[in-house]
């Protein structure tokens, strides 16, 4: 698949086949996602694959802050990737001071780049994804026993698509681009 084709054809998938994605495929996706750009090559993204049905259901029922669409979507996923990021590195100097006026906000920027790269790498292999950002971070952190220096960037449902979602309407270049 060509890069532009992947960018233009990738969709948020909410209905999945129940067959698991082999670990070998997941590892290839993460290996590709490791090439995502990051602040001073800090590579702060980390990936936690959740395959246990009871854990996924618990996340869906208790950790999506009553957002019913995400609950339904996650319950349909054969696996969930929790993308975390290491804190205190992206946007910082070695002495702990900020390198950018965005301060710690650059961590989420890098996590977002990693999430998009992960999703495009998955799509290349026929694996659909949906990025969710509406969740109870404290509960997920406790449930997955995440290290103290990591925060949850997003929760990505994944699996082989059971449908091909329609392409949403996109804004025109004229609406998006300004020349000065």
Positions of predicted regions on the chain:
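C-terminal helix-cap and adjacent tail motif
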Residues: 3-12, 89, 153-180
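A short N-terminal beta-strand-loop micro-motif at the entrance of redox/enzyme domains
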Residues: 13-28
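Short beta-strand segments
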Residues: 31-32, 36-37, 43-48, 117
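Glycine/small-residue-rich phosphate/adenosyl-binding loop
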Residues: 41-111
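Small-aliphatic-rich amphipathic alpha-helix that forms the alpha element of a beta-alpha
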Residues: 33, 81, 87, 96-143
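Solvent-exposed alpha-helices and their adjacent loops that cap or buttress functional pockets
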Residues: 39-42, 73-75, 146-148, 169-170
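Short, conserved aromatic-histidine micro-motifs
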Residues: 139-159
């Amino acid at each position: 698949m060509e890069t532009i084709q992947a960018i233009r054809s990738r969709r948020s998938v909410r209905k999945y086949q129940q067959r698991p994605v082999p670990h070998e495929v997941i590892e290839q996706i993460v290996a590709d996602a490791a090439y995502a750009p990051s602040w001073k090559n800090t590579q702060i993204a980390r990936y936690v694959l959740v395959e246990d049905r009871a854990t996924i259901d618990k996340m869906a029922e208790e950790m999506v802050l009553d957002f019913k669409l995400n609950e339904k979507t996650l319950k349909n996923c054969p696996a969930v990737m929790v993308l975390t990021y290491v804190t205190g590195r992206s946007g910082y100097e070695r002495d702990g001071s900020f390198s950018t006026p965005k301060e710690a906000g650059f961590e989420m920027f890098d996590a977002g780049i990693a999430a998009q790269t992960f999703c495009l790498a998955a799509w290349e292999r026929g694996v659909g994804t949906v990025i969710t950002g509406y969740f109870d971070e404290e509960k997920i952190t406790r449930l997955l026993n995440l290290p103290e220096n990591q925060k949850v960037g997003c929760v990505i449902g994944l699996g082989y698509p059971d449908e091909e979602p329609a392409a949403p309407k996109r804004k025109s270049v004229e609406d998006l681009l300004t020349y000065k």
